[in-house]
Structure formats: structure tokens, C-alpha cells
Amino acid sequence: MSADSADSVPSPRSAFATTLQIVSVVSFTFICYLTIGLPLAVLPGFVHDELGFSAIVAGAAISVQYFATLASRPLAGRCADTLGPKRTVLRGLAACGASGALLLSAFAFARWPAASIGLLVASRLVLGIGESLVGTGAILWGIGRVGTAHNARVISWNGIATYGALAIGAPVGVAISHALIPAVLGMLVIALAALGYYLARLITPVPLVHGERMSYASVLTRVLPHGLGLALGSAGFGSIATFITLYYAARHWPNAALSLTVFGTLFIGARLLFANTIKTHGGFRVAIVSFAFECAGLLMLWLAPVPHVALVGAALTGFGFALIFPALGVEAVALVPPASRGAALSAYSVFLDLSLGITGPLAGYVAGAFGYPQVFLCAAVAAAAGVALSTVLYQRQARLSGSGAAA
């Protein structure tokens, strides 16, 4: 066996060691999203019931975090490229802690609604910045520790940490709020951020990557096709997350929450079991198959005559969506110099933020005009467009590789 072939098949021990290296830093993403998830399901009720504001104000107060995340993506990429991933993560965790302090103050000022809502909005804005810094920094920190050959595994594990923390945080936050008082959530956010900050300081930083740095606008232009693919794939996730419970209710079906659980379980399972296929077969080929699975699942949701069929549809959608972000992300990051990886990752992630922000109101219009099943039909069309786009990108890559080899 040649040295090259031996290196291409890592031993179980080296694979486990690599996973530990990755998990040790994406754990900070888990902590960050735990600080997001814990108050997430509690805050709308607090704003509407305790402070007396309308449901629109409650929704806006929560959603402002996502706009802060979107707006701070360029900052996160620049920090990761110029200050280093570790310092970027530390700044993000500090922002998460500050958001907890502002959240605690918002609960304390509940008797003065205007002051309380102002503090809450400030908390959400700071948390959005922290989310962007930690998410981008943790991925680049992981890549710096294990090498670019494991880009897909790092991105996949970071996604598992993200969605796992949100899935755990929301019900735990509701339970704590009911058992104690909501203000405890602010204290818990501060404590988690402080713990993450302490642990992050103990881990060795990775060297800064020097060399050519592209402008953010140039990076955004270069990763635009990949980002559009991510946006198309995210429409399915956004549709299920927002409308599956209303879809079940309109059909008078029970256990809508089970469909979300199945979606999340298949999502995490696919990332755990199949992340290495991106390295083996290439990002575009994996994306084509992933979009096809997602499209099939969404079509099943559209046509489902009984809950069991809808459940299978949700499962297929979660399985398909799981690898779209890392598959296209690996190809996007490969298009820029090493010194601009942070900018590429943040620019690429912008399309996820935009897609989730746009899907809600657009799908709401479709549901109101044509019914809830048509929401999933539209998302299936988006996934089918993702298949076509990924196929075009794969063929273009093959042509460029062929011309390069011929030269």
C-alpha cells in the first residue's frame, strides 16, 4: 500500500482523535446557541403577556437578533481572518454574556414596559452579533486544528452543535421559567457564556493565515452561486419550522411536534453518518443527491393524505437538508485564498440568514392564498432548482478541471 493510500484511510484512533479536536471547539457553538435557545420560547409570552405589547411587537423583538446576525457577518469574517478564530470566539462569547446581563435587566424592569422592551431589543442585538462571531470563529478554529481536508466534518459538527443546542435549550428554558422565574434565564445565559469564555481561553489558538486577502465584496461575488443553492435548500427547513404545526392543525392531525423531532433526528443522523461522503465524492455531487432527497420529502408533505406519510416526508426533508450547508460550503471556501476563509464562510452564511428571513413571510402569503400544503410544494420547487443549480456548478467544475489537466 502506498503512503498516499494509507493516509487517505485514517485509522479509527486517528479519526476519533480528529473528532475530539473538532468537538472541543464547536462546543463553544453549542454553548452560544444554548444561550439563544434557552429564552427563545419564553420571550414572546413575556413581551405579549407581561409587558402588554402586541404579537407583532413580540415577533419583531425576537426577530431583531437575526438581522443583527446578518449585518455582523462581514465583521465576523474579518475578525476571524485578521484577529484569529480564538479571539473571535472569545469576543462572541463575551457578547453572549452581555446579552444575558441585558436580558436579566429586561426582566427586572418588567414593571416599566418601555424600558424593558428597549433592554430586551438591545439584548437580542448583542446576542445576534455574538452568534455571528462564535459561529464563524468556531468553524475556522476547528479547520485550523485538523486541516482543510476535514472542512466538511468541521462544518457538519458545527451544525450538529447549533441545532442540538436549540432543540435542548427551548424546552429547558420553558421548564425553568415555569418552575422558577424567567429572570433565572438571564443568570443562566451569563453563567454559560462565562463558562464558555473560561474554557475557550484554555485551548491553544491556531496560527493566523497570512497571504492575499480578498475584499468582502469580491468574496461575496465568488460564493454567490453556492449561497443561492444554500438559500434554495433552506426554504424547506424554514417552511417546516414555521408551518408544520399549522399544517397539522389544519388537517386535524395530532403530534405535529413528532414531525419536528423526526426532522431533527434525521438531520443529525445524516451529518454524523455521511459527512465524510463530501470529502470522498465532492461537495456538488453530495449536494445534488441531498437536494433530491429534500425535494422528495417536501413533495410527500404536499401530497400527504395521512399523518404517517407526512412524517416520512419530514424525515426525508431533514435527511436531505442536512448535508447541503457543508457540501456547498466546502466548495465555496475552496474558491478563496486561505487568508480569506473567514470572509468566505461569513458571506456564504448570509444566504442562510436571508433565506430563513424571507421564507416566513413568503410562505405565509402562499398559505393564506392557496393553503398550507402549497407551502411545501413551493419549497419542493426550490429544492428542485437546487438540484439544477448544483448540477450546473458540478459540470462547470468538471470542465475547468478537464481544461486544467489538458493544459
From Swiss-Prot:
Keywords linked to the UniProt accession: Cell inner membrane, Cell membrane, Membrane, Transmembrane, Transmembrane helix, Transport
Alphabetized NCBIfam families for the sequence: PRK05122.1 (NF003477), PRK12382.1 (NF009048)
Compartments, record wording: Cell inner membrane
Disulfide-bonded cysteines: none
Membrane topology, record value: Multi-pass membrane protein
Record Pfam families: MFS_1 (PF07690)
Annotated InterPro entries: MFS, MFS_dom, MFS_trans_sf, MFS_Transporters, MFS_YhhS-like
Protein name: Uncharacterized MFS-type transporter BMA2043
GO cellular component annotations of the record: plasma membrane
Family: Belongs to the major facilitator superfamily. YhhS family.
GO molecular function: transmembrane transporter activity
Naturally occurring in which organism (per UniProt): Burkholderia mallei (strain ATCC 23344)
TM annotation in the entry: 22-42, 51-71, 101-121, 126-146, 154-174, 179-199, 227-247, 258-278, 286-306, 309-329, 347-367, 369-389
Predominant localisation class: membrane
